[in-house]
Regions:
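Conserved beta-strand positions in repeat-built beta-propeller and related beta-rich domains
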Residues: 25, 30-36, 73-85, 125-132, ...
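Blade-level signature of beta-propeller repeat domains, shared across WD40, Kelch, NHL, RCC1
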Residues: 213-268
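A short beta-strand motif characteristic of beta-propeller blades
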Residues: 7-14, 48-55, 101-108, 150-161, ...
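A short loop-to-beta-strand structural motif that recurs across blades of beta-propeller domains
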Residues: 1, 37-39, 92-95, 134-136, ...
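Short loop/turn segments immediately following beta-strands, especially the blade-tip
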Residues: 83, 138-146, 193-195, 249-255
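Loop/turn-rich, solvent-exposed surfaces of beta-rich toroidal or solenoidal domains
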Residues: 133-134, 138, 155-197
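Beta-propeller domains
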Residues: 1-15, 35-39
Length: 268
């Protein structure tokens, strides 16, 4: 989808596969994770070019993806979803599309690869694997794109699913705090990146909250995506707006402009 908040106009292109993420490319067009492939999409011509295919022989697909401050794309895969998500097999991986257009595997044995964010000073990377219900923090070297010193930053394993849900997509505000979409809990929760403790939550008329980012002319509006995938008939009766895009105003915080892919679009 391409949505203009001023006019309310929404355009869309239907691709051949499940779309996990989309990021702009500096050289034009968009990079998207579609099924197990990274593709380049030219919006005007609707031309789709496959750049890479991953996880050969596995039933996986790309899920969340985002660019680091240097313009690399970090994107991960997930296996087939199960009703009991914490029991899913860890057959996904986290990949990095480097500036020369090459793709490397960074982390393996991932359940549901999800939210990504980088601190304002560029020295820390945050990463969510939804299956264990955890967010991790890594030291990040922007010059090389290497990560290290993994620690568990937020751990919701064992906590109430209706209250805490599964951590999904995320973003950071300019105060350095993390806003995390929580699947199954109806909430986006703001966490302190100093203590890992929740500071604030925003509740929605939907249970499957998938991701969030700041937008608007002042980057002070929080856009929140939700899902209706595999929602029961009873759930849809209670929360008919599941699957909608929401916009939240008046939070009193701002976000950062989204990074774009700065690298090569050459097919490898």
């Amino acid at each position: 989808h391409r949505y203009d908040p001023d006019s309310g106009k929404d355009e869309r292109i239907v691709l051949d596969g499940t779309v996990g993420f989309v990021v702009p490319a500096k050289k034009g067009g968009l990079i998207a994770g579609v099924g197990r492939c990274l593709v380049h999409l030219d919006w005007d011509s609707k031309k789709v070019t496959k750049l890479h295919e991953v996880d050969h022989g596995l039933q996986t697909r790309f899920n969340d993806g985002k660019c680091d401050p240097q313009g690399r794309i970090w994107a991960g895969t997930m296996g087939p979803p199960k009703p009991d998500i914490p029991s899913m097999k860890k057959i996904g991986s986290l990949y990095c599309l480097d500036l020369d257009g090459s793709l490397r595997t960074v982390i393996q044995e991932v359940g549901i690869s999800n939210g990504l964010a980088w601190s304002e000073d560029g020295k820390t990377m945050y990463y969510i694997d939804s299956t264990p219900r955890q967010m991790y923090r890594f030291d990040f070297d922007g010059s090389t794109g290497k990560i290290g010193n993994k620690t568990v930053f937020i751990d919701n394993s064992g906590k109430s699913m209706p209250e805490f849900g599964l951590p999904d997509g995320m973003t950071l505000d300019t105060e350095g705090n993390a806003w995390v979409a929580n699947f199954f809990s109806r909430k986006v929760v703001k966490y302190s990146t100093k203590t890992g403790e929740p500071m604030q939550s925003v509740e929605f008329p939907a249970t499957r909250i998938t991701s969030c980012c700041f937008g608007g002319k002042g980057l002070d509006e929080l856009y929140v995506t939700t899902s209706a995938y595999e929602a029961t008939e009873e759930e849809m009766k209670e929360f008919p707006l599941s699957g909608s895009l929401f916009r939240v105003k008046g939070l009193g915080v701002k976000g950062f402009p989204a990074n774009v892919y700065e690298g090569s679009l050459t097919v490898q």
